[in-house]
């Protein structure tokens, strides 16, 4: 199973945080990942095998000023869920991998405080790139688990004033 969930809020720093936005990010990014994993485990445990691939973010590995507080915290939580799944479910034949991409050209970029120019979007990770990585992971022998895959666009956008 491959699950990709993620939302963010426009006002991302500590000074402008709001509880409603925080709750929405946690509900979608963390609870969404948890609930999808639970549903998959109900099917995979009786089979004695399965692979769960979840998208977190590079913001779940290292803090990113662009990502902000709520998103970064939520993606760190997704990383922890994945680590715990491998510890608890590996002996049941279930493996979990978390993808940690940098900027991906998806609709979430439309909600950035400062829009990402189209010419820069084309240089970011594309959805097809993520798909190829998922296929690669699924083709690995069941005895192999990639716990985390960190993916970066070759092009690194400079941080703009007001982005972090």
List the predicted regions and their residue ranges.
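Short, small-residue-biased leader/transition segments that mark boundaries at the very start
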Residues: 1-2
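Substrate-binding pocket helix/loop in short-chain dehydrogenase/reductase
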Residues: 12-14, 21-23
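Active-site loop-to-helix junction immediately N-terminal to the catalytic Tyr of the SDR YXXXK motif
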Residues: 17, 64-72, 84
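Residue(s) in the substrate-gating loop at a strand-loop-helix junction
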Residues: 57
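Active-site-adjacent segment of SDR/Rossmann-fold oxidoreductases
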Residues: 62, 84-94
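C-terminal helical subdomain
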Residues: 98-99, 118-159
